[in-house]
């Protein structure tokens, strides 16, 4: 990330100090594969940290979630906990997916911890500017935190939704046009 782009990110509140970095999460002790509901390997591995590191890691990740969702008001995150951390061994970013669980109502949410690079950050910023919806991310040196955006993974969408009626094809084309015009 160039100095100019870093200054832009700082000015618009995208650059912020976070309590844990991507490289800190790489030191897991064990991992087990994550399968989908049909028993197919998702290429994600649920990672397990040594007990002496786990509490510190979970606390830092919960704090990051609080930064994302409450603007830093840490008084409201006491009922949140990390339920699971998954590592994706496929793709160019090898992200960590963090599942946060609300102990009060058992609702969960996700966010991602990835290696930062200028093209990824630039792409997120352009998407944020062009999209009608706010896209939340934080960058700190070589780490980027991205919110989870609800939807269907592309490969599942292609397999299960594109083989449908002509009406849906027209509807899908209209959605792409709307997105392109934004």
Task: Describe the role of every protein-language-model region.
Residues 23, 29-32, 40, 45, ...:
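Conserved ATP-binding subdomain of kinase catalytic cores across diverse folds
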């Amino acid at each position: 990330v160039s100095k100019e782009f870093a200054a832009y990110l700082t000015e618009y509140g995208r650059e912020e100090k976070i309590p844990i970095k991507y490289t800190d999460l790489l030191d897991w002790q064990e991992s087990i594969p994550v399968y989908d509901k049909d028993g197919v390997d998702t290429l994600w591995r649920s990672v397990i940290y040594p007990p002496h590191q786990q509490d510190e890691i979970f606390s830092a990740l919960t704090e990051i979630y609080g930064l994302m969702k409450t603007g830093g008001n840490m008084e409201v995150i006491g009922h949140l906990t990390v339920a699971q951390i998954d590592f994706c061994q496929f793709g160019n970013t090898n992200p960590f997916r963090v599942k946060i669980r609300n102990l009060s109502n058992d609702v969960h949410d996700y966010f991602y911890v990835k290696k930062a690079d200028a093209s990824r950050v630039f792409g997120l910023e352009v998407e944020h500017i062009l999209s009608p919806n706010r896209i939340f991310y934080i960058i700190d040196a070589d780490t980027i935190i991205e919110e989870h955006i609800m939807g269907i993974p592309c490969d599942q969408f292609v397999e299960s939704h594109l083989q449908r009626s002509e009406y849906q094809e027209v509807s899908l084309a209209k959605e792409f046009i709307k997105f392109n015009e934004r």
